[in-house]
Each structure stands twice: as structure tokens, then as C-alpha cells.
Amino acid sequence: DLAFTWQTGPLVASVVDVVESRGIRTAILDVSFTCHMPDCLEMPYQPRVRNAESLPAEAVKTATREDHVYRLGGNSCLSGDYMGSWKFDHELQVGERIVFEDMIHYTMVKTNMFNGIHHPSIALLHAGGELEVYRTFHYEDYRDRMC
């Protein structure tokens, strides 16, 4: 049997902090490229982010503050848990949602719980706006994978 999917659903993240080092602004998210989107680091593949323009990775090094260009960083302790450059039409704020389009098929198949990183819940957003949560992950899921 052959199966493939496309536009399976987004991975929704939140900005937990914005840091700047050597002129590079990084929005730290509550998801991890290493744990939730490893294909992005392995291929490399830069996912489409809703309401943002994908730029070459080097663009973040030359952007001005007014350009609203950010590197997006994951929440693991791995130093390479970040990706590329995205240009937004505004300054990102803590708590703001970042939507990675068409990522659920990568997120669910290749995911890992490196250092106990929390997994995103699996949910279905119905046409009428109702959010139905199918699965929420907890510490016990991490513990049981290790034992």
C-alpha cells in the first residue's frame, strides 16, 4: 500500500521569550525543532509560518530591528535547536502564537522527548470552531518511554 499526506495540519507554538545576541533576534518558542520537527533540521526544510515571510537563514544577521526578522528557537537545551529567518509585519510578543503550516505529519511520526521536552497535544479544529483534543502528553509518557 502507498500512502502520503499533504496539508495535514499545523503545529501551533507560543513565543515564550525574545532574546537578542550579537544583533540576532531569536524568538524562543514552546516547541522544539529537535523534538517536534526533526525533519526541518535533517533535510534541511524550512516550514512555512503563517503570516511570515521565509528568508534565507543569513538574513537574520543583517536585518534591522525595524525589519522584524527573527530566528525561531526551540525550547530544548540543544544549542542547534533553532531555524532560519522569518520576517513578520510586527514585533513579536511573548504569548503570541506562531503557526507552522503542514507540520503534523512530521511532528507525530519523527517526534522524540529529548530531555523530557513536553509534546504538543493532538487536536482537531472543527469547521464550526470547536477544538476537540484527542491526546495530551504528560510526564508519565516520557517516563514510560525510558522504562
Report each predicted region and the residues it spans:
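Charged (often Lys/Glu-rich) extended helix/loop segments that serve as interaction or gating elements
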Residues: 1-147
